[in-house]
């Protein structure tokens, strides 16, 4: 596979779980290291038209599927993907390999330098006061997507005397018509059509602190009577405003009490650990917090 230690193979399946280097007994290692696993390409997935794995890794990564390089990435705080539709072997096993690197430089985040010792070993010299976490921190998902699909959407909210209005914009990669519906449980409360429009919600239940009501948003692409793609998400209707030095939620002042929250913990470093995430939120609620700040990167 090349230079650098080969870490333990990670779990093969629909969700490929990769373990970060700082939990493998190599806390001072600096340089290249490999992850490798196999996964099964389900029969029929190739007909959907787009197949891509999604992962998140520090600090640099080169990704290979069946020996073919499919992606390079630098920066560890946002996910990235690669199209592997024509590389995956369907109805058989495939090999996924990731060459990761945790060397620091002054042009990356977090910043630092990498020094080379007299014996040739490299060491990290960070410009920060926390451990230089590295490796793949989240599960890797293999996604099969239709050829024409919803790429993104955005919403803006307005409160009215009778409820609320939601202005939306949907981005797709094809020409077919789009419909948007909003559900409260099993009840459809608003609908519209087109890639831009407005959902009018009567007697809207607003998202609020300790009462975070959520609606189900359903976006569909239609080709005749067939649904080409369907995208579901949960949204809360609320407005934020800062006026005269006060933070207003839905037009009412709110005193913010909370924490700056990091992702790392004693159990798995920065590797995803859902019980720890649950514990953190329960502790914040127990102590009376009503907010937290992502410190200092987007949390996944």
Language-model-detected regions and their locations in the chain:
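Secreted/periplasmic carbohydrate-active enzymes, especially glycoside hydrolases
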Residues: 1-300
């Amino acid at each position: 596979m090349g230079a650098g230690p080969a870490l333990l193979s990670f779990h093969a399946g629909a969700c490929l779980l990769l373990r970060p280097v700082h939990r493998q007994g190599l806390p001072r290692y600096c340089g290249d290291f490999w992850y490798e696993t196999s996964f099964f390409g389900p029969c029929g997935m190739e007909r959907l038209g787009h197949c891509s794995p999604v992962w998140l890794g520090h600090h640099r990564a080169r990704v290979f599927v069946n020996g073919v390089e499919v992606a390079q990435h630098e920066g560890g705080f946002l996910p990235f993907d690669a199209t592997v539709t024509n590389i995956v072997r369907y109805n058989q096993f495939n090999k996924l390999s990731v060459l990761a690197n945790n060397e620091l430089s002054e042009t990356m985040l977090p910043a630092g330098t990498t020094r080379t010792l007299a014996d040739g070993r490299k060491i990290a010299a960070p410009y920060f006061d926390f451990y230089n976490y590295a490796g793949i921190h989240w599960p890797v998902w293999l996604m099969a997507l239709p050829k024409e699909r919803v790429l993104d959407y955005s919403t803006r909210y307005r409160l009215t005397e009778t409820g609320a209005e939601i202005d939306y914009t949907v981005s797709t990669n094809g020409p077919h018509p789009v419909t948007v519906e909003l559900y409260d449980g099993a009840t459809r409360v608003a609908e519209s059509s087109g890639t831009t429009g407005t959902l009018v919600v009567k007697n809207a239940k607003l998202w609020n602190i300790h009462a975070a009501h959520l609606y189900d948003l359903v976006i569909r692409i239609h080709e005749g009577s067939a649904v080409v793609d369907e995208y579901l998400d949960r949204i809360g209707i609320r407005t934020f405003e800062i006026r005269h030095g006060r933070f207003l939620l839905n037009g009412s002042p709110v005193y913010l009490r909370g924490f700056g929250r990091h992702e790392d913990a004693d159990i798995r470093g920065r590797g995803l650990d859902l019980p720890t995430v649950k514990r953190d939120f329960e502790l914040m609620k127990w102590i009376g917090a009503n907010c937290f700040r992502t410190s200092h990167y987007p949390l996944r």
